[in-house]
Amino acid sequence: KEWINCVKPHFFRAPTDNDKGFGNWLAKEWKINKLDSPVITQEKDIEAIRNEDGSVTVTTAERCSFLRGSIVTQYQYTMYSDGSIDFHAKYIPQDSLPTMPCIGNTFILPNTLSNVSWYGRGPMETYPDRKTSSSIGRWNNTIDDQYFHYSRPQDSGNHEDVAEVRLTDNKGKGWLITAENGLFSYSALPYSVNQLY
């Protein structure tokens, strides 16, 4: 069974009403600089190594070029026999870059993974500039309910200061995502960024 698809670097998010304020210049800059559609070229051939414990480590690197500047992304995946995967990503700016709305990865999960639980800020969506009014705890929801239906489609459903997130089907099978060092932010939505913009 396929549990994940289309892992790729992610430097764009659907603009919010706040981003569109001030004459819409920030959201326009993101689009003009092609943050939503970088040209991706291979920087390093894919290399796979079988480790002594039976795990397999795969490394690769690619360059994401924008209208102004680029970022080299280095990936290392280690896959274990129990089904767990260690994923490390490093983002190396190469030139003067525009203001980046986000830096991370996006991927597509099967529709059967319809439940989400996380330990972090919640239960409502939180952002770096809007999180202190929320509590840290363990929260449960469905993927469909992670999206808040604003009058104008925009970025939604982000959660800050997250230690772990579980994305599961109705039998409890799926993904547990944690950060090796520190906390992270995540969103799990039934829509792609392009559908929201």
Predicted regions located by residue number:
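Beta-strand/loop-rich accessory regions of lumenal/periplasmic or secreted enzymes
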Residues: K1-Y197
